[in-house]
Amino acid sequence: MDLRSELLKSIWYAFTALDVEKSGKVSKSQLKVLSHNLYTVLKIPHEAAALEEHFRDDDDGPVSSQGYMPYLNKYILDKVVEGTFVKENVDELCWTLTAKKNYRPEGKSILPAKDAFRLWCLFIFLSEDRYPLVMIPDEVEYLLKKFCMAMSVELNYVELEDFISQDSVQQNGFTVWTFLEMMNSGKLTRGIAKETVSMAIEEVYREIVGDVLKEGYLWKKGQLRRNWTERWFTLRPSTLLYFTSEDRKDHKGNIQLDGNCCVEVLPDRDGKRCMFCLKTLTKTYELSASDTKQRQEWTTAIQTAIRLYVEGKTSLHKDLKLKRRDQREQREKRREAKEQELQRLRALQEERERKMAELELLKEAQRQAQAMLEQDEQRRRQQHEQLHQALEIQLKEAEEARASMQAEMALKEAEAEKQRTRIRELEAMQQRLEDALQQEIKARQDEEAFRYAQARLLAEEEEKMKALMGLREEQEEYIQRAQREKQELRQEMESKSRALEEAQRQLEETRANRYRVDQDVVAAQRKLRQASTNVKHWNVQMNRLMHPIGPGEKRSSGGSFSSFRIPSQKDPALRQKQKSEEQDEESKENMESRGGCEADRRLSTNGQMEIP
């Protein structure tokens, strides 16, 4: 974090403190006062003309941060020279403005105003580089650990977790006012004196904000008189300062550190223990610590300062802050990677469990299939045994049947000759039946032809009937018109009457033709019945001839057809059957004639047809 970013963080608090309505805008008069004070503390020459020119406007309304930032960057921050001003004065100016509005400790305040200011500076130093400024819980824990180390006490993690578990902290992090409220509550410093807390805050403030790597008393050997004098040393990244006492009022000198400097441990001599020396290009400084631990800490701190100079870094804690941020990012990446890996492992575990379940199902199905196969195999064996037993029984029966068949074969041979003779007789009979069937087919074809002619005549009769109905409707219309135009339509009525008579005459002719066709159909049906009677007669004879002759039957010597008797006309059964068929024909003819009479009866005396 560079100097401009540090200054902007402090100035941001001052700007937001002037924003009374929290609208993001500040009045121009207040911005002028703020700018004038910044000129003073930053040791920048005042440019009243530029200030008035930038804020010159007919409108006296407020100015937003976007409107103030160009002026702040161009006329103030761009002219800042590091080392020409005391940054603590800038922080005090901004703290004074923001504390008046926002810092109101409730009840008995534990922190003095100076400690609250130092905590505010520490918060700005360790806050994230985004606005509004917040400090993440990890940095808060790091800062509290530094305080506890300075006070040589253990951090109260229970109280810290209570503060961190708050919803606002979990979502957004610690604001500076939440942080100061936590420190003012006294829960983290319970049982510790206020003076001890203040000293710890000052020590941590000087270490982090003031870039003090190490402070303490050391014995220093003089360059001229070579005597040993106890001095208060303050180590910064580029300088080792020493004073008469720890109040740092009497500055006795400083040692510039660069890449050519080095520190070495010296053996004890001249009655001094824990000695070490700091070598520069021009001088060698011999120093003595109080104990070995202090010597180790000082040598390590000086080597760290030299390393920072070589690496071009001006602050140890800025470097540590960046490293912690990188570590957090790495931890976050590792956590995300671990979560992804866990998700992948869970997916693989679920897939494995699913496959195991499928495998179990397959095994269960395989076991069931194996059981079914065993059952099928057992059933097949039983069926095979039953089939084998049945085949043995059938084989025995076949042997017995073959023996009986061989005995019967001789009889069958004799019977076969008789059957062949009988077959020849049946073939002759079949030929006669086929002739009779052909006659029946011809009679049916004639009947179909007569029926077709009858249907055609019926269609013509229906068409003429429709025409007659149409003429009748026209006649009725003409009769109605005759009431209005009797003289004009009389001739037309006569012509229509003649046409009607002609249609009636044609209808009578059609009926006569239909009657003749009906007579032909009746004759054809009579022939068909006669042919059917002949076919039935020959079928009876053929069925009698198809009756097989048993092995034990005796035949008379009267010839092959001695058992076959042709029915005569005097047979009572045959006469009864013919009589019933003739009665059926007469009843059908009576029904047809009755239908014709009913049709004739429907015609009126004037030639019109009655509609049922």
Curated annotation (Swiss-Prot):
Outline the segment boundaries, as ranges, of region: Disordered.
546-612
Q: Which Gene3D superfamilies match?
A: Pleckstrin-homology domain (PH domain)/Phosphotyrosine-binding domain (PTB) (2.30.29.30)
Biased composition annotated in UniProt, kind: Basic and acidic residues: 572-581, 588-603
Residues of the PH domain: 211-307
**Entry GO terms, CC:** cytoplasm; nucleus
Identify the InterPro entries for this entry: EF-hand-dom_pair, PH-like_dom_sf, PH_domain
The biological processes this protein is annotated with in GO are: cell migration involved in gastrulation; convergent extension; convergent extension involved in gastrulation
Q: Which PANTHER family match?
A: DIFFERENTIALLY EXPRESSED IN FDCP 6 HOMOLOG, SWAP-70 RECOMBINASE
From the Swiss-Prot or TrEMBL record, give the protein name.
Differentially expressed in FDCP 6 homolog
Species lineage, top-down?
Eukaryota, Metazoa, Chordata, Craniata, Vertebrata
Q: Which gene encodes it?
A: def6
